[in-house]
């Protein structure tokens, strides 16, 4: 069995007038993330980690932000496409460990639903999707509630 590890990061600015999507679910919040797609930073970080692990470049290469095909697209679709891309090289998702950095909204109660949604899209067990949430103790752009960032580490496998 061949095992590879990948790391991903994403950040988007918070703005008024957009829906907030994180981990494939819509959260009630007065601001949302600005981006070409739905701007789900958690899914984007996971996509980058998966693509990196398979040595397949990054999310911007496969799903460019200047393409009308991806305008306002649901990031779960991008994640499903990413899983298919790595499967094309014989890989499957082993596990995901991710962290979201945000002052608000508090994410603890939403994490189980995010895990279920992401596990379903990636075709893995819920136990294979770890999501953590933290703040930056009011420091930096996330601390000032100007944006949200996410980090993801993944393991992919092939026989």
Where are each of the predicted segments found?
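Short acidic capping loops at alpha-helix termini that bridge into adjacent secondary structure
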Residues: 125-128
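Pyridoxal 5′-phosphate
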Residues: 131-135
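Short, low-complexity, polybasic intrinsically disordered segments
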Residues: 111-115, 145
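RNase III-family endoribonuclease catalytic core
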Residues: 2-112, 122
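Short acidic, Gly/Pro-enriched loop/turn segments at secondary-structure junctions
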Residues: 138-140
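C-terminal edge-of-domain segments
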Residues: 142-159
């Amino acid at each position: 069995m061949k095992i590879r590890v990948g790391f991903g990061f994403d950040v988007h600015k918070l703005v008024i007038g957009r829906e907030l999507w994180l981990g494939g679910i819509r959260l009630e919040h007065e601001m949302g993330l600005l981006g070409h797609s739905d701007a789900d930073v958690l899914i984007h970080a996971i996509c980058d980690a998966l693509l990196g692990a398979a040595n397949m470049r990054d999310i911007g290469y496969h799903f460019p932000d200047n393409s009308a095909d991806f305008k306002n697209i649901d990031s779960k679709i991008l994640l499903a496409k990413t899983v298919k891309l790595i499967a094309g090289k014989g890989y499957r998702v082993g596990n995901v460990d991710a962290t979201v950095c945000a002052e608000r909204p508090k994410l603890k109660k939403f994490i189980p639903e995010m895990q279920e949604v992401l596990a379903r899209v990636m075709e893995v067990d819920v136990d294979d999707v770890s999501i953590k949430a933290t703040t930056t103790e009011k420091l930096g752009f996330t601390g000032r509630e100007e944006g949200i960032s996410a980090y993801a580490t993944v393991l992919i496998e092939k026989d």
